[in-house]
């Protein structure tokens, strides 16, 4: 046991040498640890010294010295005990240099970060449950070809008059993964003017549409070929995480493809032809109305996408995270040529297309790009977007564009949507014949609640269109899930999720071992990973006890100690 040197130990050794036995008289060295423990308990509640005083008491080896009489008897001339042999009568290995003379040397230790195995089958259930209620729909099938600069202003691009739409049901397999498809149901239109807007409703016909506007899109470098309707379009938009969050480095290398607006115009032209056929069928079936005639005629746009086996579960969750409200300006659609004829227009019979919202993907008509075009894997599977008229009638002029989910393009970028206002649609044209009043009245009554909701939303969006848009203003979204920012720890095997980026950074220091907070007390070298730990440690130097019991006079330096003490009063 290491003890402070004194003359008693040498007198005890002398007594053993002369008498041959050791006296059982206790000394302070025998109970040194117990004495220090009792003194520490006794002095624990005493006031602490505010400033460290430097004196000769810091090094006790300089105070005590070996008695000269003992050195003479042992025939030791040197004052250093290090030169004494272990075979001498005084078998002592004490060394004065073995102690740290200046007291500044600190202990060193190594920290081992444990890495756990990733369980790929286990998923974050909390995030998926919250995101499952959101509508996933690719914006590629219903948006024109906007070209936007870095400032976020949309500029309509030139639109050609010819379009090529081929009908195919493309399915592909890779590594045993089944392919997914996204269907888009478009309703017929009589005309599409510059004052009309486009809305999209969800799979449920009762869900109201939301006015949205496409903000920004990029081209893949080197892709000068024309993008057909079967391609996907992503938007380059700010992420949901602040720049201080570790997820902010995922915004690099994000490209997007453009969808030309004349493809949409060709689809509208095709639906107009189907509308004329349905009006003739309604006149023939006035006495025997079918349930499918209560809604406007629709057609399915199917985009088949091969699921990417290399995409991780975290990237798939980030894809599902970016749900916002967009709005397409009517100026981008006003230049599209409605009178262009599609050379390859193909769909199933118009009588069956009205029931496509409740049918499976195999029973619906599909319109996709040419078969030689590459298949993109960032289209969500089983996604349906329904294009309906503003008032539910086939002769309405404006269609509206509802909720769209932005998907990530390269698997390493978080794509989030940007809110904008939408212009109110122009006056609708009522071209329904008086002979088909029995059947068209049902469709008008069915779409009346949806028309009221759409008109209310269009007024709100028109009022907010004059406000300048900021990239970080996505918190004004009406959806509660869109307001919630989710910051997930990206270390291997860790599934911690935080709502604040500062909490996530404090948690990540447990993985890295970083301790940026250093104690400023003189002579103290303690460092901490969190600021509250430093504050708690600093109270040990100052002796501050800010937490006082309201039932008695006791004070505590930590709140958890006060909480334990409060249980005694209960």
From Swiss-Prot:
Note: Named 'luna' based upon mutant embryo phenotype in which large vacuoles formed in the egg yolk resemble the lunar surface.
Family: Belongs to the krueppel C2H2-type zinc-finger protein family.
Phenotype of null mutants: RNAi-mediated knockdown in embryos is semi-lethal, with half of the mutants dying prior to gastrulation and display numerous vacuoles. Escaper embryos die at the third instar larval or early pupal stages, displaying black necrotic plaques.
Protein name: Krueppel-like factor luna
Main location, first listed in the record: nucleus
Keyword annotations: Cell cycle, Cell division, Developmental protein, Metal-binding, Mitosis, Nucleus, Repeat, Zinc, Zinc-finger
Disulfide bonds: none
Biased composition (Basic and acidic residues): 474-483
Origin superkingdom: Eukaryota
An example molecular function term from Gene Ontology annotations: RNA polymerase II cis-regulatory region sequence-specific DNA binding
PROSITE patterns: ZINC_FINGER_C2H2_1, ZINC_FINGER_C2H2_2
Comp. bias regions, Low complexity: 269-286, 335-371, 424-447
């Amino acid at each position: 046991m290491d003890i402070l040197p004194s003359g008693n130990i040498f007198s005890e050794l002398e007594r053993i040498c002369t008498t041959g036995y050791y006296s059982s008289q206790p000394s302070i060295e025998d109970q040194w640890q117990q004495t220090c423990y009792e003194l520490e308990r006794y002095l624990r509640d005493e006031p602490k010294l505010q400033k460290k005083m430097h004196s000769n008491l810091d090094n006790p080896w300089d105070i005590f010295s070996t008695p000269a009489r003992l050195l003479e008897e042992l025939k030791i001339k040197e004052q250093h005990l290090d030169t004494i042999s272990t075979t001498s009568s005084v078998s002592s290995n004490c060394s004065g240099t073995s102690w740290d003379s200046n007291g500044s040397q600190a202990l060193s230790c190594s920290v081992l970060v444990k890495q756990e195995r990733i369980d790929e089958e286990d998923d974050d259930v909390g995030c998926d449950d919250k995101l499952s209620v959101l509508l996933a729909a690719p914006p590629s099938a219903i948006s024109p070809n906007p070209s936007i600069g870095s400032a976020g202003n949309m500029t309509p691009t030139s639109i050609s008059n010819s379009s090529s739409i081929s009908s195919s049901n493309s399915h592909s397999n890779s590594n045993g993964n089944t392919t997914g498809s996204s269907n888009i149901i478009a309703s017929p239109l009589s005309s599409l003017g510059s004052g009309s807007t486009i809305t999209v409703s969800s799979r449920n016909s009762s869900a109201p549409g939301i006015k949205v506007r496409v903000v920004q899109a990029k081209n893949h470098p080197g892709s000068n070929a024309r993008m057909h309707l079967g391609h996907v379009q992503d938007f380059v938009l700010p992420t949901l995480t602040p720049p201080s969050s570790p997820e902010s480095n995922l915004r690099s290398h994000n490209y997007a493809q453009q969808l030309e607006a004349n493809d949409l115009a060709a689809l509208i032209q095709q639906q107009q032809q189907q509308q004329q056929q349905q009006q003739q069928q309604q006149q023939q079936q006035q006495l025997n109305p079918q349930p499918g005639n209560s809604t406007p005629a629709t057609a399915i746009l199917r985009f088949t996408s091969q699921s990417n086996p290399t995409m991780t579960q975290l990237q798939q969750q980030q894809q599902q995270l970016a749900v916002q409200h967009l709005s397409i300006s009517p100026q981008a659609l006003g230049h599209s040529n409605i009178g262009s004829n599609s050379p390859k227009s193909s769909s199933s019979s118009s009588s069956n297309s009205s029931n496509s919202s409740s049918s499976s993907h195999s029973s619906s008509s599909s319109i996709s790009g040419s078969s030689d075009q590459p298949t993109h894997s960032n289209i969500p599977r089983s996604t349906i977007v329904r294009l309906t008229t503003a008032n539910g009638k086939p002769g309405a002029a404006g269609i509206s564009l509802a909720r769209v989910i932005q998907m990530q393009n390269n698997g390493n970028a978080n794509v989030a949507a940007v809110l904008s206002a939408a212009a109110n649609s122009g006056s609708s044209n009522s071209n329904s014949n008086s002979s088909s009043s029995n059947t068209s009245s049902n469709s008008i009554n069915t779409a009346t609640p949806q028309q009221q909701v759409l008109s209310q939303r269009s007024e709100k969006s028109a009022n907010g269109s004059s406000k300048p848009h900021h990239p970080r203003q996505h918190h004004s979204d009406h959806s509660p899930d869109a307001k919630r920012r989710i910051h997930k720890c990206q270390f291997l095997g860790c599934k911690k999720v935080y709502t604040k980026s500062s909490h996530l950074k404090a948690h990540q220091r447990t993985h890295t071992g970083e301790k940026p907070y250093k104690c400023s007390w003189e002579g103290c070298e303690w460092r901490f990973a969190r600021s509250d730990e430093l504050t708690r440690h600093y109270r040990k130097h100052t002796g501050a006890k800010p937490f006082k019991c309201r039932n008695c006079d006791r004070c505590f330096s930590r709140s958890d100690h006060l909480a334990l003490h409060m249980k005694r009063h209960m």
